[in-house]
């Protein structure tokens, strides 16, 4: 539609193709500046002579700082100041960027005497350059009282060890938090009689799904520059999504009024939710406030890996009940979330695991959603694209596909039969109805794009590889209903153009551009006529910030309202100058006309008139808050290729179809969805935050933490099937986690790829039932005492590998953990885990006669479990890493290995794998002969699994073998 014939109307339902600026692929406003390297980021804008701020971090997962000797460090030339826990304010706060009162507990200090994870700040060092600061940091001498740590979040709730024992800890909102129980949050929501409905179902899928923590890995690390202005106010220029929340958090932490603080943001080099938390701001702000000198802090990549706010690790247990015809009747969901050492975003992310997954199925008769969020002694988690929905959708969609397999129903058919549709009430979604929903169209189109009917379920390619397709659905919200506030100020410039002031943060996703498109549509001008002034607490109207997918929906509506108010004021001023009734004037975009008299004024004439003898300000500020949060929906279909020998999964084609209401900018929307797909694939196939047994992060750089590149992806295709949301600007809903990114795309890929990895196993059949045999019955003759019960790093030797295997087994529905022992003490200690259903035990008193008796007892128990294979692990290998053990098991299962064992340096060893045909031979072993005899007898059938680190496979035969891999020394 031409601009000349365009008339703005508030309702464009069914006519969005007639829009002039909205729904058009407008180029990003800052594109040229970014690609030509203009100085637009924090480090570009900070002066070269400002103080450099760094922190000394704890090497221990849980400790009390007894003293910090800083005399030698303070003597280093160029050092301005060194601060410890004794120098900082003592009021607690949260770093989570949330509206006050924050659901996240107040559990932080700037520096705390009690450090709670490896990487927790111990001291702040400020100096004239990096060289002197690094030197001073090395000279600091810290005395620690090392405390036992909780590194397994399954053991946190009601543990006698408290992560936050302090009395000053507090929770401002009723979220079920209790620091005396290590609980950051706990709650339950339900409707209907779940147990009764599940009992009536023909089939119930019950499984626990584990989603590990993952890094946002944005290109620009955390960074902040601070200075004092001429009025004695603290100015903070930061790479943040939340300028107003950041100001309040700094006020709480520093103990100074908010009016003494100004927070603004330049361009941001990515955030994906990480910068919804105040990570770097507090340290330079404290230094500048204390010294009066400008300072900056730039996180290294290692710091951004080890001291940031990654995705919450969650374990989601689901029971899903359905009838034989595929009708899903009930969902019972329990989420255990690991918030880490501090509670940022813990109480809120967990809620989305149920409230943004269960509502996708609109015909439920009953549901229950319960959760616990627990503290542990690892890096604190935070906000990340998907914000908890990712983990929950992964579990629900996996269970639905499993249900389809059990019932013999096509995975797409079971979704079509049960998915929420437009006009339907959404269970577990805050009492809301799906007023705009094209999910059915998304699923249908994804099916067509991937060629489902020709490719489902899988095809053997004849070269040791199989190909398969998978499907999943996802949803998100468009804001935090009844809470999020977006605001916009629009004013007329003296040349007739416009300036728009917003506090929404453009993180590189283009919200400045899409909000300009909306303003241009409302004001019937070109997008280039809109100048955007970004987030600044001194000049921008209040905005909650760019998170919760709220910018397009919430701030966009505020822009629309402000423009309508401004149009009226422009007409009022023009009518006054033309001496005509205001209600007879018409705003045309280029000016105001009065048809009856033929009078008119251009926008430049109106702007000039406003500067003299005028009582009407040609500007308008409007805010917006919504009582509802209409979900965007997505369907994703993927084709993968699986190497049956290695277990490698390769993405061949991904077809994503999105309903985000009216698409404001198709180009920006498409690239954001594509980026989210890559993040989801990375989370599934590449990324995994790992810790040592002492809480030290293993993958603290991009050399160890693998993020995917475009070369790792197959074909990515994105299309839109738009509904029209009546409460959104121009019918739009959100398309972003934090800004303009569809959160659900990050949830679809883990479910699809992981599930099809299982479904494609071997001949595309069912997964193997695997019993993990943990042999804990050795006699310890050369050790001098019972080596299995010998204390090592705070717990018995046998518990080290066992605890890792328990976590592994909990992530795989078809794996069972079975402990065989002759020791009653071990049976007693494991009784709580048996009661909790995490493992089973077998008492084998004859094990004293030799290992063959232990193996026989284990195999007989495995046969009762109908095991297809047994994987034998020995309890005197405490250094075997969880990742290695899980990869061994997955590799053996994926290859349907007849026999298998690990190899290192040309030598074979434990663990070992035995499929069912070899069980009888294992039971025929005698004396102290182990499974190696069976392996040698069938050596041609043994599948090798290579392990590079020999220390992982170390057997503890003598006390001299208690080697510490970190130092090369030995435990006393």
Report each predicted region and the residues it spans:
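Glycine-rich loop/linker segments at domain edges
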Residues: 24, 30-33, 100, 177-224, ...
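Helix-loop-helix junctions that connect adjacent transmembrane helices in secondary transporters/permeases
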Residues: 163-254, 419-497, 699-706
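Conserved N-terminal catalytic core of the sugar/cofactor nucleotidyltransferase
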Residues: 800-868, 883
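C-terminal catalytic domains of large/alpha subunits in multi-subunit enzymes
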Residues: 2, 85-86, 255-260, 290-295, ...
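Conserved beta-loop-beta/alpha segment of the NTase-like Rossmann-fold superfamily
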Residues: 848-916, 920
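N-terminal glycine-rich phosphate-binding loop and ensuing alpha1 helix
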Residues: 769-822
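Conserved alpha/beta core of the MobA/IspD/sugar-nucleotide pyrophosphorylase nucleotidyltransferase superfamily
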Residues: 772, 920-972
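Flexible, low-hydrophobicity surface segments
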Residues: 1-176
